[in-house]
Amino acid sequence: MGALFGTDGVRGLANEELSPELAFKLGRAGAFVLQEETGARALVIGRDTRLSGDMLEAALVAGICSVGVDVIRVGVLPTPAIAYLSRAPEAGGGVVISASHNPYEDNGIKFFGANGYKLPDRLEDRIEHLVLTAGGALPTPSGIGVGRVREMPDAMERYVRFACGTGPSDLAGLKIVVDCANGAAYQVAPQVLGRLGASVVPLFDTPDGTNINAGCGSTHPHVLQQAVPAEGADLGLAFDGDADRLIAVDEHGRLVDGDHLLVICGRHMRRHGRLAGNTMVVTVMSNLGLHLALREAGIRVLQTKVGDRYVLEEMLRSGCCLGGEQSGHIIFTEYNTTGDGIITALQLLKVMRETGRPLSQLAAQMERLPQLLENVRVRDRNAVMSSPALWEAIARYEHGLNGEGRILVRPSGTEPLVRVMAEARNETLLTKVVEELVRVVTEIDRQQAG
């Protein structure tokens, strides 16, 4: 990570940390680098429903056109839809304006190459260098050399048709409650499921620019958990603001997180000979229960640090076709080049259709060990993480778990947070360990602030 780019592009408070001026510079530098690397003549631009999206899109479009690259605007669409459309013959890459699961005040910018993948560190570093040091040296064509802006009127329909082709052909008889998070999936997700024949009950599908992720979506599924049994539905699906992640709810209103989804899909694919190398990729945050359930099924697990980009890198390196995170970022490389909440939902529904089993039974394949996660807001997450006192405390409390649990303390890649996570069979001990480590982190942060 550099001064601008984090684990998922550039993010910050819109109009302050992520200003129109910075968006303009990112547009210029990003378009120049993609043009130089792949000969890109046009970039697809999409966004989520945040109020600041229009402002940042205008600045970004101006920057891209100012170096002679065309823009294809597609409006509000999920991040994975932009990844898919970036591979279209008329495109040479794409840009998404979104801050995913963050509150509406934040926004972000991330780039995709012509292959539909997020840019590697090497290219992000190059863009960052140009933004910070050499932006004025970039080309400034005039006359017919300036980039043009055009629309892609059938952008949503292209993605809907693509998504429908990846899942079960008929969902008739299934009732599904869909929490759209007032975000980028608010039109697409109900449309895909409805076209396949499901009875869809939409929730949080009226974005107003300020209500994205507000008490809804994959990070706040409590309303969905109540709605599924109340509606007599077969399951619920919750997306985040840009719909690159999915959390499900079974027919009884119980959460089915990313770890469960990986186990359900991975074991089914293994059983049908569709799991490449009988191997999956997960992160260090995955529950111990996932490892036990996959080991029982004869599935090998590769681990990475947190972040879907690292999961994808390992999948491509090792030839795996399924990987993901507990948070619901699930990647099926057979279908898309990034985490895709709608594709994940369709693969889950495919398992339900092919097995004839309700989601509660499928989720029971994994027993989740008690896990507790606390986010501690700090002034300097990297300074806290480098404190010897923190690592001494971690070692001390890890020893106290007697080999029946684990501790993971890590900085957030996108926010000023230190995440304290622990797992243990003894829930009382688990709570005590996390509370003590939160206290240690808070005290270290206070001391460092002077």
UniProtKB/Swiss-Prot annotation:
GO biological process terms held by the UniProt record: carbohydrate metabolic process; peptidoglycan biosynthetic process; UDP-N-acetylglucosamine biosynthetic process
Keywords tagged on the record: Isomerase, Magnesium, Metal-binding, Phosphoprotein
Binding residue positions for Mg(2+): 100, 240, 242, 244
Catalytic residues in the record: 100 (phosphoserine intermediate)
EC numbers, comma separated: 5.4.2.10
Substrates-to-products reaction catalysed: alpha-D-glucosamine 1-phosphate = D-glucosamine 6-phosphate
Cofactor binding comment, as recorded: Binds 1 Mg(2+) ion per subunit.
Gene Ontology molecular function terms on file: magnesium ion binding; phosphoglucosamine mutase activity; phosphomannomutase activity
Cofactor(s) the protein requires to work: Mg(2+)
Entry annotated with the keyword Magnesium: yes
Modification type Phosphoserine: residues: 100
PROSITE patterns xrefs: PGM_PMM
One GO CC annotation: cytosol
CDD domains the UniProt entry points to: GlmM
Post-translational modification: Activated by phosphorylation.
Biological role stated in the UniProt entry: Catalyzes the conversion of glucosamine-6-phosphate to glucosamine-1-phosphate.
The family this protein is said to belong to: Belongs to the phosphohexose mutase family.
The protein's name: Phosphoglucosamine mutase
Taxonomy of the source species: Bacteria, Bacillati, Bacillota, Clostridia, Thermoanaerobacterales
